[in-house]
Amino acid sequence: LQLTEQQGNQALPKGAARDYPDYAIRGFMMDSGRKFIPMSMLRDYVKMMAYYKMNTFQIHLNDNAFKQYYNHDWNKTYSAFRLECETFPGLTARDGYYTKKEFIALQQLADRLGVEIIPEIDVPAHSLALTQYKQ
């Protein structure tokens, strides 16, 4: 496909082409735990990854800041959990999260394009949002 774009006339030069990846897992990790990444950007990344034959997209969905930046006070330290949770509705981050419906749609898009989504919920190390949850 890249050759046809380079030729400009949608024709391939005469010859044989072998096109296969050297590695079984060709991945990328996006950290949306520390900074919210809009769903539209995640969809764009899935499409771009499929184009470049990348097949594994790990999305980091929870994290917290360093307490040193918050006067060493865990109660004031920023934390985020980015997936909608019906069981614990107050758990999701106020500055952005993904609904179940839109995250499932992202997984379905990725599946159609040959990209596996690996949702990463990092515990116990980055679980401040979970430990501070109050109903």
Regions found by a protein language model. Give the residues of each.
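Feature activates predominantly on carbohydrate-active enzymes
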Residues: L1-Q135
